[in-house]
């Protein structure tokens, strides 16, 4: 069974009998395409983007919101499996976040992969607030 079928089975398990507002298989394919497009060669190493932003329609948010943690985990695991298959590395752990795009119609989504620096520990005692 390939990664996409495994992903699809896991997401179907999350939703159960509830009908998803769009195809998560298409979402996974879009995330993999964006990962491929945004992968950079850094010091001779193929470095995959570690931040994945999924924009959804405001109308879909109430139905999807309870599932965001599980969906984020499944998309993250899918992206990690795709990167491993291609021998890509990440700077840090991949992060998947959902955001509302008021311009999107119900049932539509967009995925953006971005290269970001690894998280740096911050000591809040050294922060100066304006």
Per-segment meaning from a language model:
Residues 1-124:
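Long, compositionally biased regulatory regions of eukaryotic proteins
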Residues 125-130:
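Conserved small/polar residues in nucleotide/adenosyl-binding loops
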């Amino acid at each position: 069974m390939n990664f996409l079928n495994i992903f699809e089975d896991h997401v179907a398990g999350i939703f159960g009998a509830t009908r998803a507002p769009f195809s998560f298989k298409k979402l996974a394919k879009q995330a993999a395409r964006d990962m491929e497009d945004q992968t950079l060669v850094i010091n001779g190493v193929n470095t995959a983007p570690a931040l994945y932003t999924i924009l959804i329609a405001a109308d879909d948010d109430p139905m999807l919101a309870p599932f965001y943690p599980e969906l984020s985990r499944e998309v993250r695991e899918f992206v990690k499996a795709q990167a491993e298959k291609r021998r890509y590395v990440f700077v840090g752990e991949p992060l998947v976040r959902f955001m509302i795009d008021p311009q999107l119609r119900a049932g539509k989504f967009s995925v953006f992969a971005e290269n970001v620096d690894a998280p740096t520990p911050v000591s809040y005692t050294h922060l100066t607030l304006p």
